[in-house]
Curated annotation (Swiss-Prot):
Family: Belongs to the universal stress protein A family.
Coiled coil: none
Protein name: Universal stress protein G
Transmembrane regions listed in the UniProt entry: none
Gene responsible for this protein: uspG
Superkingdom of this protein's organism: Bacteria
């Protein structure tokens, strides 16, 4: 199947990832590696010089919380945990997914999407952005 799978997740909305987990596992059947990726918003500290230290501390707290939740998510998979890598990065989801795809020479992105609404049209805003700007195949799971 696939050797390198990137799975962007929102650790603060884990229910979006439940179905995507099963699809990612299926694609990684033989010996594929799943890279769970949580992307935090880019820093605003450049425009908030007076609060830069507080912003940094808050970002560190968010990063630690995201890493902890990603480790919890690893337990939801049925494949060997050594085949699941976790990553927390800062930036926009679409840019980080593309950057990581190049870094890892990834084969596919598997992303969960919420039910359609008038504001997100057919996909969630992050899933939609990833699909529109992807440089590799994307499987969107509802």
């Amino acid at each position: 199947m696939y050797k390198t799978i990137i799975m962007p997740v929102d650790v603060f909305e884990m229910e979006l990832s439940d179905k995507a987990i099963r699809h990612a596992e299926f694609l990684a059947q033989q010996d594929g590696v799943i890279h769970l990726l949580h992307v935090l918003p880019g820093s605003a500290s450049m425009s908030l010089h007076r609060f830069a230290a507080d912003v940094r501390r808050f970002e560190e707290h968010l990063q630690h919380e995201a890493e902890t939740r990603l480790q919890t998510m690893v337990g939801h998979f049925s494949i060997d945990p050594s085949r699941i890598k976790t990553h927390v990065r800062f930036g926009s989801v679409r840019d980080v997914v593309n950057e990581m795809g190049e870094e890892l020479d990834a084969d596919v992105v598997v992303i969960g999407s919420r039910n359609p609404s008038i504001t997100t049209h057919l996909l969630g805003s992050n899933a939609s952005s990833v699909v529109r700007h992807a440089t590799l195949p994307v499987l969107v799971v509802r």
